[in-house]
Amino acid sequence: MEEKLEQAYLYDFYGELLNEHQRQVYEDFVFNDLSLGEIASEEGISRQGVADLIKRCNKKLLDYEAKLHLVEKFMSIKSDIRRIHELTNDFKKSHNELLMNEIEAISNQILEEL
């Protein structure tokens, strides 16, 4: 997964676990696409301080993911739903019962994961 996209997913799931200052700096870097220098000027800290803070935030978010696996589960379910969508379209064309069996198996797997 692209680094910025991964950072966005991690933030979406775990961002509220960061303190307000960490969230602001992380949002400015990841979502608002501000440079380290721009953030440093805005926050009144050094560029190195901003870089260190972003690195610590990334580590925290990755640690949460390592323990909770919410992004991993989300991506897995998203992939399964995409596959169900494809199979449904195929079924509309062919009316093949085997496709319905596969859809049922995937949906059962999703329910077990939840």
Swiss-Prot record:
Top-level lineage group: Bacteria
InterPro entries given in the database record: RNA_pol_sigma_r3/r4-like, UPF0122, UPF0122_fam_protein, WH-like_DNA-bd_sf
Family, similarity comment: Belongs to the UPF0122 family.
Cited function: Might take part in the signal recognition particle (SRP) pathway. This is inferred from the conservation of its genetic proximity to ftsY/ffh. May be a regulatory protein.
Name the record gives this protein: UPF0122 protein EUBREC_1504
Originating species: Agathobacter rectalis (strain ATCC 33656 / DSM 3377 / JCM 17463 / KCTC 5835 / VPI 0990)
